């Protein structure tokens, strides 16, 4: 019996796969537990439609990420911060991924999720700093920061 897997089943198939399995196994286990459904011509068509929609959505997300990368790669895109500095040359407050995301939105209208900004520890130094940002699983860019003394 041909089935379409609705979830990953160890040793049998992954979600979205169409495979031939024994009829008893399909009816008594896979279909009862909603791990798979019978592969009729209609359900195969639905699956192909879903996969096309998923690919289209992924392509749109990638295109959006590339547009953000193009803006971040421009020389004039430099996020300005003015911080109070102590006698040792370190800032009183630290610059976090959240602050960077908010300032990027405020100064350039570019929306980047704070969870995508790769920051090992908050920034406490003044000067020009480049911070990597993971825009998409296969696309990274650099945010340029200019931190000056207030």
From Swiss-Prot:
GO terms for cellular component: ribonucleoprotein complex; ribosome. InterPro entries: Ribosomal_bL9, Ribosomal_bL9/RNase_H1_N, Ribosomal_bL9_bac/chp, Ribosomal_bL9_C, Ribosomal_bL9_C_sf, Ribosomal_bL9_N, Ribosomal_bL9_N_sf. Transmembrane segments: none annotated. The keyword Metal-binding does not apply. SUPFAM superfamilies: L9 N-domain-like (SSF55658), Ribosomal protein L9 C-domain (SSF55653). One of its GO terms (biological process) is translation. Keywords: Ribonucleoprotein, Ribosomal protein, RNA-binding, rRNA-binding. One of its GO terms (molecular function) is rRNA binding. Pfam families: Ribosomal_L9_C, Ribosomal_L9_N. Gene3D superfamilies: Ribosomal protein L9, C-terminal domain (3.10.430.100), Ribosomal protein L9, N-terminal domain (3.40.5.10). The keyword Cytoplasm does not apply. Binds to the 23S rRNA. HAMAP family: Ribosomal_bL9. Belongs to the bacterial ribosomal protein bL9 family. PANTHER family: 50S RIBOSOMAL PROTEIN L9. This is Large ribosomal subunit protein bL9. It comes from Streptococcus pyogenes serotype M18 (strain MGAS8232). The lineage of its organism: Bacteria, Bacillati, Bacillota, Bacilli, Lactobacillales.
């Amino acid at each position: 019996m041909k089935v379409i897997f609705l979830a990953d089943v160890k040793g049998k198939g992954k979600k979205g796969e169409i495979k031939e399995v024994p009829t008893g196994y399909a009816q008594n286990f896979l279909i009862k537990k909603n791990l798979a459904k019978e592969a009729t011509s209609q359900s195969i068509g639905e699956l192909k439609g879903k996969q096309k929609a998923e690919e289209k959505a992924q392509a749109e997300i990638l295109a959006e990420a590339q547009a953000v990368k193009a803006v971040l790669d421009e020389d004039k895109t430099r996020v300005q911060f003015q911080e109070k500095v102590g006698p040792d040359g370190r800032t009183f407050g630290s610059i976090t991924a959240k602050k960077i995301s908010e300032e990027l939105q405020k100064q350039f209208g570019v929306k980047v999720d704070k969870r995508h900004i790769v920051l090992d520890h908050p920034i406490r130094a003044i000067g020009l700093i480049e911070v990597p940002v993971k825009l998409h699983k296969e696309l990274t860019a650099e945010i340029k920061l200019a931190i000056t003394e207030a």
